[in-house]
Amino acid sequence: MEDREEIWIVMKKRVITGMLISLILCTMTACAGGKTNNGTEEGIGMESNEGMIAKAIAQETNQEHVSVDAIPEKYTKKRTDEAGTIVHISYPSKDYFLDGKAITKEANVYLPYGYSEDCKYNVLYLMHGIGGDEAEWGMVDDDSLVKRMMDNLIYYKEITPFIVVTPNGRSTENCAREGSDFNSFYVFGKELRNDLIPYIEANYSTYADADNMSLAREHRAMAGLSMGGMQTINIGIGECIDLFSYFGAFSAAPTSNPAEKTAQLLKDSPYEIAYFYNICGTEDEIAYDSA
């Protein structure tokens, strides 16, 4: 059992590294883009420093195997100077799996150091695995590995500041880690679209457009581990591609959408994917086939 737990910890660290260094170093327009002299927003293109990094990473990760043995210490140390904050939120939702009654859901939100209502931020919705909840990624206090990596990547100016949201992926009143129905993961798209995204955009400074959420899709990313990877593919790409442009699936659980269905959805969609980071270990007997 201890060996399995150690392997799980190592796998999560590798996934976090890939997620933070590869997924979000894309061409999402961020606060650092600022405005041009004529007042228009200036995006981050492939010719920019971040764009070139994203292009290089994309080329590297197209190789057959990519190995990361350890996260560099500069990214994992706890910052005491320029550190972001983690906020625990409760938001109104519905039991979309059962009777549709009103319920309250919870999530954790990472706000980067220097967060300001005068600046607009991109948002990453980061999903947990089948045995987890909103706390699985460790975003509960200052010792969070995700928080430490975010703080350091921002401090070293390797990424522009953005918001991270870790919700509970079960859209039902009984959303506990144990004893809940795993089928409730498959209806999370309704909660995501109707409740969570509107709450985040109403309470934090994002690129939201109250009348048309699709206008800000270039400023949203969805990613997840295991069951959360399934949700990213099934829900993020399959149901909410009008809301997201960036996706990451890490050892995704087998999806209910075969690859052919997903491919057809993309072909028929008027929306394009800006970046899709899909990773799985070759020895993962469950997730490898779905990758």
Please annotate each region the language model reported.
Residues 1-2, 291:
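Accessible peptide chain termini
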Residues 1, 36-37:
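A subset of signal/propeptide-processing and intrinsically disordered low-complexity segments
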Residues 27-30:
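C-terminal motif of bacterial Sec signal peptides marking the signal peptidase cleavage site
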Residues 2-14, 20:
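Positively charged n-region of N-terminal signal peptides that target proteins for export
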Residues 32-34:
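Bacterial signal peptide processing site
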Residues 37-291:
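Non-catalytic cap/lid and distal C-terminal segments of serine-dependent acyl enzymes
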